[in-house]
Amino acid sequence: MGYNYFEIIAGEFEMTDIHFIETSGEYKKLGDSARIWSSGTWDVSLKKANSLIGGRIFLHTSQKGPSFLCGEIIDVEEATTGRVTFIFRHDRSLVNTLVGENDGNWGQEQITVNR
C-alpha cells in the first residue's frame, strides 16, 4: 500500500497530500459510482505515487484557486514511464481547499503537502 510499517509503529507516520493544476480535463468518473474517479495522467514516479495511497489528491484550476475535485487516493496505475493515474474516492467535504502559503512551493503543476 505504500505505507512504511516501521514509521507507523514508531508513530512517525505522516500522510501526504498532492495537489495538481488541472487544465487538460482528463479526469473522469469511473463506472456507475459517483464517488470513484480517475485523475488523468501526471508526471509522478510510480514509487512516489504508491507512497501517496491513503493520502488525498486535490485538483485545482490555478495555484491560488480552490480545489474543485478531491478525495482519498485508493490506487495508482502506471500510464507511461514516469506518468501515473490516481484512482480516488471523491470527498465533497474537501472541495474548495486552498494550498496555504506555508505549505511549500508549487512545482510546474503540482505540490505535495504533509499533514
What name fits each language-model region?
Residues F6, E12-R115:
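Structured alpha/beta reader/binder surfaces that contact nucleic acids or chromatin modification marks
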